[in-house]
Amino acid sequence: TAPIYKKGVPMPKGGEACGKNPLGRAHHDKMSPEATAMVIEREPEKFQAVGVFTGPRSEGLVILDVDANLGAVEAKWGKNLAQAPRITSPKKAAAKFLFTVPQELWTEVSDISLAASGEGWEVLWGRQGLLNGAYPAGGTYTLEGDLNAIPEAPGWLVEHMKQSLKAKNDKKVTKQGRDGRWSMRS
């Protein structure tokens, strides 16, 4: 877990927090929920939310982050989503759903950006996501469900994540296959 800086507070290395920035050491140290809670309790004017890192670092936690079109996503995959812990914010038509990816698949999957999905959702894998506390635009995140009973990611989600990794690898091969030193010469 990671304590999240309150939106608008000064960051240690300059700039202003956006409300999603984790405490710097949380990038390198594995902080327990208790350690995160202690940081927030000691400096509530500075830290007001809890984040979590996804992927192998968190035993395979993956977050399906629906930023728009929640109704369409629930119509398509609602049966699987109903079993997962759900995090909502004041933002309409949005929610986050928590799953785990089995360890044997960790090297076969990747995150998916909002733009890449094209459907108003993204997949957080190897990245950080907010779970609880202050929502950057005002209000708070609300958790429904049991964090001790996070289900395995459904097949369709794992397949999307596998396709994302394949697309990224194909793109790297394509870029590496060209020698740009000669392309602009006449």
Please describe what each predicted stretch is:
Residues 1-185:
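Conserved phosphate/metal-binding and DNA-contacting active-site motifs used
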